């Protein structure tokens, strides 16, 4: 089944779920809170007493007021093609940890070898580009690559693909886009091809980090934005993409989860110094 058809199928599944629950998302024109995405305030910058402890399995959403106040993520522009995308998770080269950059959706590299700017500052052209539904590319030389998302949520780690595939229907997932800003939605389907989220995005959000929020105020990365269809978004799993491009995600030293103590987490990470 094609990716667009799968996104359409995800929309149908979501619609059926709403019908079966006999619930409405609005009453008298006013929005009603979805129990699966209750607006629990998350304190940005909070840290656990023991950063290596296993994180919670209950994930939260980011309240709209807090999301709206967050600065938009860095925009990447390929100058020759004009292609605009979002800087994905901050990474370090597996072979050279001091080399920093961003992982991005593969289709952002429209003219290979062309110059790329990050927030107006020129960095290296995209490299190691792989195309397709789960395409990926990287750009290096980004001095502003930091282990945070959504304006200050510290990155704790990356969930393995099989763990993300077991996330339940309705699990809150958030995105940090250069165009749409910080948005949160819910899981509609997970399979071997990727993660489907009820989350409207805009052109230019491709590559944006998809992440889960813990009540410690930290972010756990699960994927990057690849495609959209209506109010639904398809994301590629982050962990296997990192292996394909020889990169590791930067984590914050005060928030990092040790994959040796929590096997749900990938070891494709490095603590930012």
Regions found by a protein language model. Give the residues of each.
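Bacterial signal peptide processing site
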Residues: 24-27
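C-terminal motif of bacterial Sec signal peptides marking the signal peptidase cleavage site
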Residues: 19-22
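Catalytic histidine site
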Residues: 30-34, 39-144, 189-206, 213-273
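N-terminal export and membrane-targeting signals
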Residues: 1-15
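Short basic/hydrophobic patches in alpha-helices and adjacent helix-turn junctions
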Residues: 175, 211-212
């Amino acid at each position: 089944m094609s990716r667009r058809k799968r996104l359409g199928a995800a929309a149908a599944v979501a619609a059926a779920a709403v019908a079966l629950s006999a619930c409405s998302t609005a009453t008298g024109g006013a929005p009603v809170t979805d129990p699966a995405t209750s607006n629990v305030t998350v304190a940005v910058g909070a840290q656990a007493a023991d950063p290596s402890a296993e994180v919670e399995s209950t994930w939260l959403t980011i309240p709209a007021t807090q999301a709206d106040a967050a600065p938009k993520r860095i925009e990447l522009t390929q100058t020759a093609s004009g292609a605009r995308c979002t800087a994905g998770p901050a990474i370090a080269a597996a072979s050279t940890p001091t080399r920093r950059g961003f992982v991005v959706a593969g289709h952002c590299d429209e003219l290979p070898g062309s110059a790329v700017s990050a927030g107006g500052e020129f960095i290296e052209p995209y490299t190691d580009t792989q195309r397709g539904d789960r395409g990926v590319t990287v750009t290096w030389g980004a001095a502003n690559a930091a282990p945070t998302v959504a304006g200050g949520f510290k990155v704790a780690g990356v969930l393995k693909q099989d763990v993300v595939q077991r996330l339940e229907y309705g699990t809150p997932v958030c995105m940090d886009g250069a165009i749409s800003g910080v948005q949160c939605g819910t899981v509609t389907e997970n399979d071997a091809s990727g993660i489907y989220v009820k989350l409207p995005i805009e052109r230019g959000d491709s590559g944006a980090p998809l992440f889960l929020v813990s009540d410690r105020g930290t972010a756990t990365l699960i994927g990057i934005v690849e495609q959209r269809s209506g109010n639904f978004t398809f994301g590629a799993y982050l962990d296997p993409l990192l292996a394909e491009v020889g990169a590791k995600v930067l984590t914050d030293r005060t928030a990092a989860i040790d994959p040796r103590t929590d096997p749900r987490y990938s070891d494709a990470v490095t603590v930012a110094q």
